[in-house]
Amino acid sequence: MSGHSKWSTIKRKKGALDAKRNKIFTKLIREITIAAKIGGGDVESNPRLRVAVNKAKVANMPKDNIEKAIKKGIGGNEGVEYFEITYEAYAPYGVALMIKCLTDNKNRTSSDVKSVLAKGGGSLGTPGSVSYMFYRKGLIVYNLEKYLEDEIMEFALEAGVEDILVSNNEAEVITSPDDFDKVLSFLKTKFKEEMAEVALIPENKISLNKEQAEKIILLIEKLEDFDDVQEVIHNLEIPEELS
């Protein structure tokens, strides 16, 4: 079975991490700050902060940067108010996009997103036009070059997971949102994950040829180049030669 679209995109982009490290860190710091501001600075009692910090660690963000972002969040309003916006959109060939943003200027972000979509052959949808194609699940990813598949499956099943998907040397453990923290804590006693969060997962994925898929990937990357765009979730089945 093929891998989850979101992780495939993240994995594919890891080779270019150094070139975009500052931009990635900017997005992560913003997410950590907002999470701490909303739910407090305790990673154990703030699930959103825990996920944000985990992402930062996977991206090799220095511990000092993470701590500063948390302190900034719990320090209160410092004159900049951020808004969370999720745009629902269509890329070419009917690919659905969920564009998650954190912005201090809604008009600017809306204009930027619309412009990139239009130039890439996509369009903004109405609320509800795309979101019904996705559902929330806990997603934990392991590198099978580091661990044995059977070992991960044994422990994951013992933890009570919903599903395990294996492809391209990765094992993707799927849980219900409610069981995510429990399962992750159990698996952490044995394995170190590559990625872990409660994510939007597509009900069905769209398969395209390499040329078409490259066009969609380019559009997603252009959207994610904006600091205001935290991530773009999609239902594209990424061809193996592009993963």
UniProtKB/Swiss-Prot annotation:
Keywords: Cytoplasm, DNA-binding, Transcription, Transcription regulation. Its main location: cytoplasm. Pfam families: TACO1_YebC_N, Transcrip_reg. One of its GO terms (cellular component) is cytosol. GO terms for molecular function: DNA binding. GO terms for biological process: regulation of DNA-templated transcription. It is found in: Cytoplasm. HAMAP family: Transcrip_reg_TACO1. Belongs to the TACO1 family. This is Probable transcriptional regulatory protein BG0025. It comes from Borrelia garinii subsp. bavariensis (strain ATCC BAA-2496 / DSM 23469 / PBi).
